[in-house]
């Protein structure tokens, strides 16, 4: 006995009107419907044909980075000694710079670029600093900042305002540039030594940069020299900073600094090294404060290292009648 299922397959259990399959040509359809079916069929066949023949592909030729011509090697101890030597080699600095500032970023949804200013930087170890910016054309003071490492003064003559206090930021200002402190400048201008008690690690990485001379992409290997601190007597280690060192010349091209919670607070970029008094120093430095929302771009036009600087050159006098804001 045939099963109901086999009868269904043979069409014996299918209703008569359902079992009859009529050709497409016998169906009553409007001319528009028939035209649509013909077009859809042709389009489907065309797509299948093009896809199988490769006509739908498009290959783009990408620039392939070239390997670095020179790759240098160094042990962790040699990297530490190199950073320490560079710090010890600079006792003082007298520089003429072009200063460009910008505030905002992706989190703000916009970036505001300020007019470039000519300025001067004085630095003397261990912590003396003075940064002066001049207004365009008239070249009167736009701002003047001085610090002895413990206290600082920031004078803004166009507004007859001044800020006096320690190096920290207790209450951030709505104006990001008002949160700029001398220690941010100092630690970016001179990469500090690595202490005897610091915990250090070294990793290797690769970055792709465009060569400023050949304009070609170059794949440069680097060393990442990380400095850690231990949280009390615990096993917890927190990052303090990471110095990124190019293996093409063993010079730093970036430093990342972290706060007590492990957040990046300052990223400083170094490029266009030149030799001054037998010391290689970058002539372009970018200080990025992502959380504060500002960047300071410094282009060095003139630099003198290790010449005597007097205490008077770091003394900032606030004119009478200036509105002074004292901060902790």
Predicted regions and their residues:
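An acidic-aromatic
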Residues: 57-58, 126-187, 322
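Gly/Pro-enriched, hydrophobic low-complexity segments
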Residues: 56, 201-321, 325-328
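Sec-dependent bacterial lipoprotein signal peptides
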Residues: 2-55
